[in-house]
Regions:
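Short glycine-rich or small-residue beta-strand-to-loop segments that form or flank ligand, phosphate
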Residues: 52-64, 89-93
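Active-site-facing alpha/beta catalytic cores
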Residues: 1-5, 85-162
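Solvent-exposed alpha-helices and their adjacent loops that cap or buttress functional pockets
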Residues: 47-49, 132-133
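N- or domain-start disorder-to-order transition segments that initiate the globular core
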Residues: 8-47
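Short, basic, glycine/proline-bearing loop/turn elements
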Residues: 28-29, 60, 112-115
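N-terminal beta-rich core of secreted/periplasmic extracellular enzymes
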Residues: 31-42, 76-89, 95, 125, ...
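Glycine-rich anion/phosphate-binding loops
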Residues: 62-82, 115-127
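Hydrophobic, well-ordered secondary-structure segments
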Residues: 45-46, 67-70, 76, 106-111
């Protein structure tokens, strides 16, 4: 019989499990407290119990980790200065769902070269979110499927469903 299924698959590589990745970049009690507190503040703002403005601020998507961390440090400083009026959440998107040609995002193509090392992309994304959480800056991201949130949702304070 002539093979007709999966004829264009070059190779298979199982992904790291969410539990394994979380072991590599664990959430401390301090970080989980920050995430829970930030989620509660966002809920209060959306429901009208907190009169501050909620602002999700950041680049289209993260591609340069160092530039992203520099941005986060600057945003944290500004956030602290305006926290009585505006609750700032850093927009940290790792995927580009509406991009069909070109770079698809840090998780899918962390090296920006078409290599699609998704495991490395997941590691970079979780590490980045962990670093931002350590700054006590709330993070917001877009969730496009039921898989990726298993790796990063515990470090995310706000989510868009894409």
């Amino acid at each position: 019989m002539i093979r007709v299924d999966d004829v264009r698959i070059k190779s298979l590589k199982p992904l790291i499990s969410p539990a394994e990745l979380k072991e590599m970049f664990p959430v401390t009690e301090e970080i989980s407290g920050h995430v829970a507190s930030s989620r509660s503040k966002i809920e209060d703002i959306i429901s009208g119990r907190d009169n501050r403005l909620l602002a999700l601020v950041g680049p289209c998507s993260i591609h340069d980790i160092e530039a992203g961390l520099d941005y986060a440090r600057r945003l944290k400083k500004l956030s602290d200065e305006i926290s009585d009026r505006i609750f700032v959440v850093m927009r940290i998107y790792f995927e580009k769902p509406r991009t069909r040609l070109g770079w698809r995002g840090l998780i899918l193509d962390p090296y920006l070269d078409g290599s699609y090392d998704i495991e490395e992309g997941l590691k970079r994304a979780r590490s980045f979110l962990s670093d931002v959480a350590k700054m006590k800056l709330p993070a917001g991201s877009e969730m496009l499927d039921p898989i990726i949130p298993q790796y990063i949702a515990d470090l995310t304070c706000w989510a868009a469903i894409g």
